[in-house]
Amino acid sequence: MRLPRILIAAPASGGGKTTVATGLMAALRASGRTVAPFKVGPDYIDPGYHSMASGRPGRNLDSVMCGDELMAPLLAHGFVTPDPADIAVIEGVMGLFDGQLGTGRGSSAEIATTTRTPVVVVVDTAHASLTHAAVVAGLATFDPDVTVAGAILNRVASPRHGAEVARGLAQLGIPVLGQIPRTESIFVPSRHLGLVPAGEWEDSATKVAGLGGLIAEYVDLDAVMDMAATAPDLDVEPWDPAAALESAGWQGHPFGESPLVGMFAGRAFTFRYPETTEMLIAAGFRVVDVDPLTDRRLPDGIQGLYLGGGFPQMHATDLETNSELADDVRSHAEAGMPIVAECAGLLYLCRHLDGHEMAGVLPMDAAMAKRLTMGYRVATRDSISVVGHEFHRTTTTPLAD
């Protein structure tokens, strides 16, 4: 399968991966190319910006949760869905080789190796010049299975500064695709779990367009496309949700023809993997969004509810005010309607969140805490194991009956 692609990586976090990757997606789209966006790992926030920049669903490539064997099929699926793209741009995670518990598992390098994707390193040039070439040399030689094909210089102080770094990289045979100057005009707000999601930030579309303009001015887009075209063909069939259900032993549902499933959405619930919706549809369900900030009741005829992730704690007052929907959710739960809740969804089902009344489906209170809980988790029951990921600053406390 022909699949032009690059992976945007860096020596460490905070060097500009998201700025460059998101801006590159926006710039390529503005130039008339169709971009398939991806993020290494389980993160929901960056794909929200990728989606805004590319006009397509932002997708994840997580080998820890999904397994190595699904990385290339998921990449191919995102490349051809909803229509074939011209290039796949994959944003890495942390430093190039950083992964689970220091093993490199799930790292950008692992995804690059598994999918045979050339790597473009974002070099934050602040505080040094030629030394950056030594760092990139280490990245390029640390693992012979990882192809460091190019570099983009970020936060360049002056043309002379950029030329010094580029000269060092040229000695390694690594071309520089662009030099982005230091600028304070591009700012994306952050809070306790990283960037503010694109769906919650009113200026996000304007800022993403600004990133695209910045990249278009300082990065050679044609050179990026040429580098992506060097990626070898993949001998793989795109992941298919219907086939995935069949291989998992799915035998249908007992809810009649085309049952309706509601999925929480809106500013308080922005976290959702597109493959979840695709699998529900492939399983014969109709899917409708429910915004707990504005919708006063669940849709008529609803037979299931999926409450994904987000930041309900940032909207707790408005969620509490919409008591009609909370009452409706609780009534449906008491009547036996299936509900799947994760992360923010669990918080919404508690009785209180930071003192604000929630749906009260579960006899628990939830509250924000200072401690960050982060990492992959494995849940096992009856010899069946499911891998998930925790990333939050909340606690739940069971209440006495």
Predicted segments, located by residue:
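ATP-dependent carboxylate-amine ligase catalytic core
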Residues: R2-T19, M25-T115, V123-G150, P159-A163
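Residues that mark the start of a beta-strand
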Residues: R5, R33-T34, S258-L260, R286, ...
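Beta-strand->loop->alpha-helix junctions that form or flank phosphate-binding loops
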Residues: K39-V40, V176-E184, R286-T294
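Short amphipathic alpha-helix with an adjacent loop that forms part of the alpha/beta core around
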Residues: H77-T81, S247-G252, D295-G301
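C-terminal and late-domain segments of enzyme folds
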Residues: A112, P254-E257, T270-M279, R286-V288, ...
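Internal gly/pro-rich beta-alpha loop/helix module
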Residues: S129-Q251
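Phosphate-binding active sites in nucleotide-utilizing proteins
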Residues: P259-T321, D327-E334
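Cysteine-nucleophile active-site neighborhood
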Residues: P312-D382, V386
